[in-house]
Amino acid sequence: MITLTIFSPTDFQGLRGPLIIYDPEDPQKHLYDVDDESTIFQVGDSWHNSTVPLLAGYVATGIVPVSDSGTVDGAGRFQGGPAVPFAVTNVVKGQRYRLRIINQSARNVFTISIDKHFLTIIEADGVATQPLLVNEIEMLAGQRYSAIVSTPPQLSGSLALELINMAHSFTQTRPLINNAPFVSGDPSRNLNQNATLSRGILRYAGGRREDPRTPMTLGPDPTNPLAFVEANLKPLVNNPPGIPDVNITLNLVVTTGAAQWNVNNVSYLPPVVPTLVKILAGADEPANFNVTENTFLLPVNATIQITFPPMLMTKLTPSTYTEYVTIFLILLHPIDAFPKNNFWVVKSNSSDSDVINTIDPIKRDVTAVGAEGTIVRFTTDNIVMASGTDEVRTDVEPDAAWEGLCPAYDALPSALQ
């Protein structure tokens, strides 16, 4: 039994929140002193426009939208905007805090760092890990990490770090969380975006109530960074994957300048009868699904390996497009095998292309695919009535049914909405 952090992703515009299940018998409880609501950090992205114009612009140009700002516990600033208060976490010297960091973004990738402090990762996506000391953590949308931060008694003064070079200015209010470059989008396309304004505050008892006065940093010593590498994560309790019974290769190709992803040279096209409706009706043969549904049938109680080769970019001009990749992994008894089950990351995109770990790979439920290639394994032994991939949806345009979902709400006076 371990302490579990669950995040339910949603749309660009929607409610976001975590479910924290605390384990009174956490085997790593001796590593920290404080683990409560004050140490939950929900980082996210803020969008001033709705998905409707964002989607229209993406489809027309192929240019990936960029958020207006990053937030910590719902608070953040944008360039030229109001100086809203940053989220503050009050700490006491000499204590060890378990930070539960959750990336609730629709798109943003964040680099998490704390001025003059190391982070010790002990959990990834609800799976306990061997302690891993780092300066910073890169987090994809949907990922969760628990990291311990110590507040040494010798830090009675105040120190600040610049992003690259160490500075010796002094403050007792430290930048807590900083925004990284944004995945698949160019921040210069959104003038509201200023990565240095996406931060929270770790405030020592007795510290002045002021904003951080330093730029982004990557932890205590930028000259000797302890860079975070996903492949270095090891499970606290090892449960190595079995030999795969089924091997699937998914070549993902992004067409530059167009809103199109291809999976094995197939661009997803929505069928007349939705894929999930077919599954719920009992479809369990390849002939029941169109090629453009990207549907794979899997045996029950098997080990599945999916290989994502290094991704390539192409400048082909497509005749059709999709805004997202949907891959249905259908079992003969419909179960949700991927990604709601944790999978072993036997080859992380963070490692060299020839580094494969089948001895003690980390298990998690969100990982990256990209230039180095990724290989995951999972077992089809968790039978539930669902199937398919989870995703943050920006591709669904509102229709009459959507508009009619909340007529009672729309009829309320504006003061009550």
From Swiss-Prot:
Gene3D superfamilies: Cupredoxins - blue copper proteins (2.60.40.420). It comes from Ampulloclitocybe clavipes. GO terms for molecular function: copper ion binding; oxidoreductase activity. Coiled coil: none annotated. Laccase-like protein; part of the gene cluster that mediates the biosynthesis of clavilactone A, a meroterpenoid that features a unique benzo-fused ten-membered carbocyclic ring unit with an alpha,beta-epoxy-gamma-lactone moiety, forming an intriguing 10/5/3 tricyclic nested skeleton. ClaR, ClaS and ClaT are sufficient to produce clavilactone A and the function of claX, if any, has still to be identified. The biosynthesis begins with the prenyltransferase claS that transfers geranyl pyrophosphate (GPP) to hydroquinone to produces geranylhydroquinon. This is Laccase-like protein claX. InterPro entries: Cu-oxidase_2nd, Cu-oxidase_C, Cu-oxidase_fam, Cupredoxin. It holds the Pfam family Cu-oxidase.
